Amino acid sequence: MHRSKLFFTVFLFFLPNFALSEVKQANSVGTSPIPWLSGVINGSYERRINPEIGLGLNGFTWNYVSSDWKFSIFGIGPHGRFYFEEENNGLFVGGSISLMSYSWSGLGLSGSGSIMSLGGEGGYQWKWVNFYNEVTLGLAMAGNIETPDGTSANVGSAIGGIGYKLGWYF
């Protein structure tokens, strides 16, 4: 019990110093909190390979269950960004590729499959010491829904939207 109190006290003492350090950060983690309201859990990791270019990985998952319907989807994919300003602050443009796997069941039927999408985005990132906020405008094109039995449905339509992300550089 005393060890856990000591650890917690040390953690609280050193966390502000670690989180507010002015060291040049090459890594970041972030999330879009607004989709959490509908149960979508998402996150991203990005590493700066030079001051203007970042490469990373995005992922999300969502599960919906009701009395007669169940749906689950998981997506992951790489992304790249070009920042017009150095120090992780300002305008950026980027692109991504995602692979999404889904399954559903309901009304006596079930299915599963995968979807590939290609997307682009532009936005602005505000940095405060190690923390950041960003607003993005994005567009994605989804391919066909492929199922194991060989059937497919074309969902090749554009999906666009405005996004908000917050995160932490380390």
Task: Specify the residue positions occupied by each region the protein language model found.
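Predominantly the C-terminal beta-signal and adjacent terminal strand-loop region
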Residues: 127-170
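Extracytoplasmic loops and strand-loop junctions of Gram-negative outer membrane beta-barrel proteins
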Residues: 26-28, 104-106, 146-149
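Gram-negative (and chloroplast) outer-membrane scaffold detector with strong preference
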Residues: 44-137, 168
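Cleavable N-terminal export/targeting peptides
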Residues: 1-25, 170
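Transmembrane beta-barrel domains of Gram-negative outer membranes and organellar outer membranes
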Residues: 30, 37, 140-142
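Short loop/turn positions at the edges of beta-strands in beta-sheet-rich folds
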Residues: 35-37, 49
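Transmembrane beta-strand segments of Gram-negative outer membrane beta-barrel proteins
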Residues: 23-33, 95
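Residues that define the transmembrane beta-barrel architecture of outer-membrane proteins
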Residues: 25-27, 37-39, 70-76, 89, ...
